[in-house]
Design a protein with these regions (language model features):
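Cleavable N-terminal signal peptides of Sec/SRP-targeted secreted and luminal proteins
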Residues: 2-16
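Extracellular, disulfide-bonded carbohydrate-recognition/adhesion ectodomains
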Residues: 17-240, 247
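Long, extramembranous regulatory segments enriched in acidic
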Residues: 18-63, 69-74, 95, 230-334, ...
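Membrane-penetrating hydrophobic segments
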Residues: 321-355
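Single-pass alpha-helical transmembrane segments
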Residues: 352-359, 534-554
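Membrane-engaging insertion elements
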Residues: 358-403
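Transmembrane-helix exit/juxtamembrane "anchor" motif
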Residues: 370, 374, 546-565
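Cytosol-facing boundaries of transmembrane alpha helices in integral membrane proteins
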Residues: 521-541, 560-566
Length: 566
């Protein structure tokens, strides 16, 4: 009875203490993240790092508006296909949009030497200005030749606007003619020319009189001579003849000289290139030009996002997230989401971080829960929460910085002869993309692991800080809480939370309460010892009586005899 009274007093006394617990936020989020050692870890909040949304339009960028070539290929614009006259005026662009199904290319059948490089050089500029290089009205030739293969938009035969088809002058004269142009402009000029290869000798003499001709094009760095390759070819656009097209760059101060007695498609206009653009020619059939502005333009559309990664397109320009071949990379920006254990026991005592998170904490990640004679309360610790949030912000910036190595997959364009190079290039690009995606995923896994470890450490640090503040004035209950050995009203609780608690102020009261606890424990231990001794003695006596009784009974019925030998 005495023991029961003592234990009851201890239980009532223990649960009557004012209590403060340290805990962390939990919520009903279903977000999960992966770490280096765990998969699908529940967390209170995550940030998606991969942008998957895009606006299906080609927008203006910080460098200006795109140039849509409409029905024309870029080589048709450069050489001046008569059906592309809309582009004759001086124009500028941030990038160029070319439709793959555009019908207008080189109107007279033939091929452009180093076309891919020409496309690159031309598109890298921000604008052009057409410059007249030569006036052939003073030459002893007939200028402005036309062809049925190059009809104008208005109908009727025509020819390229940037080069001039020179033929013999009646009656049958085509002597050597030559001309000179000096580049006195403020920049480099792209100049163009061609060589005509008739299908037979009859057409050769009909156009140029001379059966054997020689044309030369020279600059400070170019020295080329050409003779026609006469012979029949398959009919293309109504022509058995062919033209080879050429181009060059005339730098500022350099001189261009041309000389011919036939078959030269002579340079007439050049392009003075100015500025720098994104240097891209986007080939897409369906995406329209939009009335929009973007910092990031991909081949698949515009992206306006602050995320560090995107999977919309590996071809992009401007200030874009890095391309990764991943659908999702989630970064933990909250806590490990551990639902709290329901209160148990006689008095439903509040519990700390050992028992799980608190769903009621909405204004911070870490904080306190207290109970005293004035009631209960919960408050976030703003300092530790803000420090954790700052670290998360730094983590996002850290990921961006670590992935900031320049990596862009350029849309390489190769001729039919170089298709093997194109195939090898695509394989290399694919391998680089796989490696880049692996690096990004590994970096996120590392940061997630570090984040969750830091959160655990932050809660433990806050707990240890409160322990130091309370000193010997409280008892660690082992579940993230402290039972305070003195009366602690709300004002007192606030000092514990904000770090201004003075343990010496309550030291005497706490010592007295601790001595009472120790006294009760001592009395309890003494009672246990006395009861233990009594129990041992009683058990021994009972055993002795049983043995003696057994012997006496056995001797009475003769089953047991005692023999004494002398």
């Amino acid at each position: 009875m005495d023991k029961f009274i003592i234990m009851t007093m201890l239980l009532v006394s223990t649960n009557a203490y004012d209590r403060i617990c340290i805990g962390y936020q939990s919520n009903n989020s279903t977000d999960t993240v992966n770490t280096l050692i765990e998969q699908n870890v529940p967390v209170t909040q995550t940030m998606e790092l991969v942008e998957t949304e895009k606006h299906p339009a080609y927008c203006n960028t910080d460098l200006g508006a795109p140039l849509e070539l409409r029905d024309c290929k870029i080589e048709a614009v450069i050489y001046g296909n008569p059906k592309c006259d809309i582009h004759l005026k001086d124009q500028g662009w941030s990038y160029i949009v070319e439709r793959p199904s555009a019908p207008e290319g080189m109107c007279y059948p033939g091929s452009v030497e180093n076309l891919e490089e020409l496309r690159f050089v031309f598109s890298s500029a921000a604008s052009y200005k057409r410059i007249r290089l030569f006036d052939y009205s003073r030459w002893n030739v007939t200028s402005s030749g036309t062809s049925k293969a190059c009809n104008a938009s208005t109908g009727g035969q025509s020819f390229y606007r940037s080069i001039n088809w020179l033929t013999k002058k009646k009656p049958d004269t085509y002597d050597f003619n030559e001309g000179t142009y000096v580049n006195n402009e403020e920049g480099d000029i792209i100049f163009l020319w061609g060589i005509h290869h008739p299908p037979d000798a009859k057409e050769q003499t009909a156009l140029y009189k001379n059966a054997n001709t020689l044309s030369s094009v020279t600059t400070n760095t170019i020295n080329r001579s050409f003779q026609p390759n006469i012979g029949p070819r398959p009919l293309v656009r109504g022509q058995q003849g062919r033209m080879d097209y050429y181009w060059g760059i005339l730098k500022r101060g350099e001189t261009l000289k041309i000389r011919t007695n036939g078959n030269l498609i002579a340079p007439e206009f050049g392009y003075l290139l100015k500025g720098e653009s994104h240097g891209r020619i986007i080939q897409n059939e369906d995406i329209p030009i939009g009335s929009c502005h973007t910092k990031c333009q991909t081949y698949a559309g515009a992206i306006n996002s602050s995320k560090p990664f995107q999977n919309a397109s590996r071809h992009y320009m401007g200030e874009c997230p890095k391309y990764v071949k991943k659908e999702s990379l989630r970064l933990a920006v909250g806590l490990r989401n551990t639902p709290s254990i329901e209160p148990k026991g006689l008095f439903g005592a509040i519990a700390g971080f050992i028992e799980g998170g608190w769903s009621g904490m909405i204004d911070g990640w870490y904080g306190f829960h207290h109970s005293n004679s004035e009631g209960t309360g919960m408050a976030a610790d703003q300092k530790s929460t803000q420090e954790a949030i700052d670290k998360i912000t730094n983590k996002v910036n850290n990921i961006v910085d670590k992935m900031n190595r320049e990596f862009e997959v350029v849309n390489h364009e190769f001729s039919e002869v170089e298709k093997r190079i194109n195939m090898i290039n695509d394989k290399i690009d694919d391998q680089i993309e796989e490696l880049w995606a692996y690096n990004a995923e590994l970096l996120v896994l590392l940061e997630n692991q570090k984040t969750l470890d830091e959160h655990d450490s932050n809660v433990k640090n806050l707990f240890d800080e409160v322990r130091r503040r309370l000193s010997a004035n409280a008892i660690d209950t082992g579940n993230g809480c402290f039972d305070i050995l003195h009366k602690c009203d709300n004002e007192c609780m606030e000092t514990i939370k904000n770090g201004t608690y003075n343990h010496k102020e309550y030291e005497e009261e706490a010592k007295l309460e601790r001595s009472k606890i120790n006294g009760v424990k001592l009395e309890e231990n003494t009672t246990y010892k006395i009861l233990s001794i009594y129990s041992t003695v009683a058990a021994s006596l009972c055993l002795a009586i049983l043995i003696a009784g057994g012997l006496i009974l056995g001797m009475q019925n003769g089953s047991c005899r005692c023999m004494f030998c002398i």
